[in-house]
From Swiss-Prot:
It catalyses: 5-phospho-beta-D-ribosylamine + glycine + ATP = N(1)-(5-phospho-beta-D-ribosyl)glycinamide + ADP + phosphate + H(+). It is an enzyme of class 6 (ligase). Its EC number is 6.3.4.13. The lineage of its organism: Bacteria, Pseudomonadati, Pseudomonadota, Betaproteobacteria, Neisseriales. Belongs to the GARS family. This is Phosphoribosylamine--glycine ligase. The keyword Metal-binding applies. Disulfide bonds: none annotated. Its cofactor is Mg(2+); Mn(2+). SMART domains: GARS_A, GARS_C.
Length: 423
């Protein structure tokens, strides 16, 4: 069968690569894809992004189903459009995707359904926001209401930082429409984890646990990014935390969306903050697989992903299980110079073949020129995954592979997975 994956990042490379491992799958088209998906066996890039063009392509090629990688097409209603055209697609509707595309929607939804999260208030007026922050004190978290590619969250450790973030979003319009409303919420202490599940509207199939590293620099310093690395499984998600996350967050969310008359289908990702007592709180929802969590998680999936997605689209997730490798996977992101602000593009990347002999290189912000050189083409350029019998081995494998790669201004964290090693 022929499948389609929408997107051009590392997450989409990993999803398409895993789907292509199925003996049932002939070709996975990736729209628009990157330099990695262009050369991966059984994968083929197509330069289409408009929903109608994609729908026509699916009809012409008899695509069995489509998987949506990134948040932007979901928020733009790609699932609604495909379903209206009678095509199978895995992802949430535009309404359901508001769990990610509007922080205010998500917080109000959590309050309504008693899902644990930080206390919050929403503001469109800068003066009112400044007053609220002065009353609450720091540390405090300022979030752009809309989609901001993972960079719309400012964890303000001082009042000055909080006031500056409010001005950036509400007065200086630095986030555009995404920051025209801000959600201000209490700062939560604890350790973060990514809890990702597949949902068919009613049933839930959990993916392996993982932990992302949001900050740019070692020791969780520097600016927030889309994610600088991840590992799976995440030891902070103990069996008790796992049960609580399912029963207090995931299942009430799925039931709540159904009660709202908008069943959630697709990947649902709860960003958790696990406090000292082991209680999980929801920091955010994403309506798709995480990036870079997808890369290590897919590296551990032994099941046929196409079977899981088909079951989910058909409302039969309760009839399948996911089998996981007992190994640990560590993925490290290589980012371009000046990421996350104004990443430099167009630098030649060398050493990819050598790196792929040691680990697995997933492409994100890459493109190829006429000569066949692979060039940087975005903020997060590559994610290098290593597998090992324990976290330390997997980390050594990932960094061993990464050392083969070079491009001008390459930056990466050297401490990915150290939290798990030091536990």
């Amino acid at each position: 069968m022929k499948l389609l994956v929408i997107g051009n990042g590392g997450r989409e490379h990993a999803l398409a690569w895993k789907l292509a491992q199925s003996p049932k799958v002939e070709t996975v088209f990736v729209a628009p894809g990157n330099a990695g998906t262009a050369i991966e066996p059984k994968l083929q890039n197509i330069d289409l992004t408009a929903h109608q063009d994609l729908i026509e392509f699916c009809r012409k090629e008899n695509i069995v189903f489509t998987v949506v990688g990134p948040e932007a097409p979901l928020a733009a209603g790609v699932v609604d459009d495909f379903r209206a055209a009678g095509l199978k697609i895995f992802g949430p509707t535009q309404y359901a995707a508001q769990l990610e595309s509007s922080k205010d929607f998500a917080k109000a939804f959590m309050a309504k359904y008693n899902i644990p999260t930080a206390q919050y208030q929403t503001f469109e007026n800068a003066d009112a926001a400044h007053d609220y922050v002065n009353q609450k004190g720091a540390p405090i978290v300022i979030k752009a209401d809309g989609l901001a590619a993972g960079k719309g969250v400012i964890v303000a450790m001082t009042l000055d930082e909080a006031h500056a973030a409010i001005d950036d979003m509400l007065l200086d319009n630095k986030m555009g429409n995404a920051g025209a409303r801000v959600v201000i919420e209490d700062f939560l202490q604890g350790e973060e984890a990514s809890f990702i599940v597949m949902v068919d509207g009613n049933n839930v199939l959990p993916m392996a646990t993982s932990q992302d590293h949001k900050r740019l620099l070692d020791g969780d310093k520097g600016l927030n990014t889309g994610g600088m690395g991840a590992y799976s499984p995440a030891p902070v998600v103990t069996p008790v935390v796992y049960e609580r996350a399912m029963n207090e967050i995931i299942l009430p969310t799925v039931a709540g969306m159904k009660a709202e008359g908008h069943e959630f289908t697709g990947f649902l990702y709860a960003g958790l903050m696990i406090d000292q007592s082991g209680a999980p709180h929801t920091i955010e929802f994403n309506c798709r697989f995480g990036d870079p969590e997808t890369q290590p998680i897919m590296s551990r999936l032994n099941s046929d992903l196409s079977d899981l997605v088909e079951a989910a689209i058909d409302g039969k997730l309760d009839s399948v299980t996911a089998e996981w490798s007992p190994q640990t996977a560590v993925g490290v992101v290589l980012a371009a110079q000046n990421y996350p602000e104004t990443p430099k593009k167009g630098d030649v990347i060398s050493g990819l073949d050598a790196a792929n002999q040691v680990g697995k290189v997933f492409h994100a912000g890459t493109t190829a020129n006429e000569k066949g050189d692979v060039l940087t083409n975005g903020g997060r350029v590559l994610c290098v995954v290593g597998l090992g019998d324990n976290v330390a081995q997997a980390k050594a494998k990932a960094y061993g592979a990464l050392e083969k790669i070079s491009f001008d201004g390459m930056q990466y964290r050297k401490d990915i997975a150290d939290k798990a090693i030091n536990r």
